[in-house]
Amino acid sequence: MNVGEVVQIIGVVVDVRFPPGQVPEIYNALTIETDKVDAFGRKFNLTLEVAQHLGNNVVRTVAMSTTDGLVRGAKVVDTGAPIKVPVGRPVLGRLIDVLGMPIDGLGDIKAETYYPIHRPAPALVDQSTKVEQLETGLKVIDLLVPFMKGGKIGMFGGAGVGKTVIVMELINNIAKQHGGISVFAGVGERTREGNELLLEMTEAGVLDKTMMVFGQMNEPPGCRLRVGLTGLCLAEYFRDEEGADVLIFIDNIFRFAQAGTEVSALLGRMPSAVGYQPTLATEMGQLQERITSTTKGSITSVQAVYVPADDLTDPAPANTFAHLDGTVVLSRQIAELGIYPAVDPLDSVSRILDPNVVGQEHYQVARGVQKVLQRYKELQDIIAILGMEELSEEDKLIVARARKLQRYLSQPFHVAEAFTGTPGRYVSLKDNIRGFQEILDGKHDGLPEDAFYMVGTIEEAVEKGKKILEAS
């Protein structure tokens, strides 16, 4: 057992000197015993991760929790391995932190298997290239931005446009409809949201199929930088050992890049564009390349991406783009119209919206919807200046259908039922395509626009439309 001592503390960066010939490897976990106890009455040991070798047997480390009360000369023990976390069935339904410690107050996790958080990506020969759509039950996503099983989907949006609510609805739908296992990695987001998510998932009865890892906004950057890797370990176990199709939700991948920026600056590296770390692309690649399908199973990821100041060219979202198979762009303009989920049907793209993958019918309906909405967007300037009267009859029809389509893209969510009072809806892909096809064909031109707002299937819209017409 190698024992060193603390020689310098600068915030969350701690320098440790070891005896000659006993210097720990990069990424090794070091522990410091303290006399503190955590919120659950457990003895609190501080964990450090080796980040740099400074020479003279000194290593520079990054703390995974607060260094309050730490003093120079404190004894540091090298564990001889990276941070290891419990994986497998015992972790289902539990909430853990970056070190794999339970933080839900439900007692210890009795796991037999532990994985190191730093693991290589699957080899090229082990990766699967099969392309298949994953049904989510959300109309706008299934039709226009189909998710690929084992793919990576980014959810882009500024503050308050509904990223987290969509993520929660997806967890709910996947667990209930597919019985799939989900991992939720809360990376540097609000503690309140994490608490709400835990309580709502317990109420919805989907927690037993989910594992949660939290490293919230109040945690040190070292923790926020590594919590995504902890979540990945949990998913990798089920993919590799049980051959399962796992979903991992990362909220928010931007905070991962942000934590990397903080750690990089604290370690004294020269910043690159906009103050980001010079290793941004490398760190992002190491995380993203582990999220993939193998011949045994798949990991599909949905990543919420906060866009600073709504600027998609910022290095953090721009670097994330490179890894994604699909991008769901959430628009403030659509949210302002009261249309939720506020997915932009023209900006959002998916690699598998291809007739060879989704089929000719699905492809043509999706492109038809986009064509009508695009034409409506082009006509909006004319309408604003000259009014609807100046449009040709054909354009008037396009505008009427576009407004119906726009409203039909909205959908009541199960997880928002408590706030909206409207029961949530899951719409199958078949019903979804049929509904949009009927609107495009003009079968419902006689119904008022409001009939299409916040409904599930087209039958509901027709019923709602009849009631509105009768009432008027």
UniProtKB/Swiss-Prot annotation:
Gene behind this protein: atpD
UniProt GO MF annotations: ATP binding; ATP hydrolysis activity; proton-transporting ATP synthase activity, rotational mechanism
GO CC list: plasma membrane; proton-transporting ATP synthase complex
The enzyme's E.C. designation: 7.1.2.2
Subunit annotation: F-type ATPases have 2 components, CF(1) - the catalytic core - and CF(0) - the membrane proton channel. CF(1) has five subunits: alpha(3), beta(3), gamma(1), delta(1), epsilon(1). CF(0) has three main subunits: a(1), b(2) and c(9-12). The alpha and beta chains form an alternating ring which encloses part of the gamma chain. CF(1) is attached to CF(0) by a central stalk formed by the gamma and epsilon chains, while a peripheral stalk is formed by the delta and b chains.
Superkingdom of the source species: Bacteria
Pfam families noted in UniProt: ATP-synt_ab (PF00006), ATP-synt_ab_N (PF02874), ATP-synt_VA_C (PF22919)
PANTHER family, A to Z: ATP SYNTHASE, ATP SYNTHASE SUBUNIT BETA, MITOCHONDRIAL
UniProt key word Transcription regulation: no
Annotated coiled-coil segments of the chain: none
Protein's organism: Desulforudis audaxviator (strain MP104C)
EC top class named in words: translocase
Subcellular location: Cell membrane
SMART domains, per database record: AAA
UniProt KW Membrane keyword: yes
Protein name as catalogued: ATP synthase subunit beta
InterPro entries: AAA+_ATPase (IPR003593), ATP-synt_VA_C (IPR055190), ATP_synth_F1_bsu (IPR005722), ATPase_a/bsu_AS (IPR020003), ATPase_alpha/beta_chains (IPR050053), ATPase_F1/V1/A1_a/bsu_N (IPR004100), ATPase_F1/V1/A1_a/bsu_N_sf (IPR036121), ATPase_F1/V1/A1_a/bsu_nucl-bd (IPR000194)
Signal peptide location: none
